[in-house]
Regions:
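Acidic, low-complexity, intrinsically disordered interaction modules
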Residues: 5-58
Length: 58
């Protein structure tokens, strides 16, 4: 899964639950067992790519 696809999936799940994107990211991090396998996969890719992007800044 590409980062663009991962973000789209996470955004659609957040919209479905009526949550803001970063609130949903925190929710997934705290409650991974309440998510689908695809959401966990998308979150993992988002987390890896976010860390990689911030490592370039620091």
């Amino acid at each position: 899964m590409r980062i663009e696809t991962a973000i789209k999936h996470l955004e659609s799940d957040a919209d479905f639950l009526g949550m803001e994107f970063f609130d949903f990211i925190a929710f997934v991090k705290e409650n991974p067992m309440a998510q689908t396998r695809k959401t966990i996969e998308a979150y993992a890719i988002f987390a890896i790519e976010s860390k990689r992007a911030w490592d370039k800044v620091a």
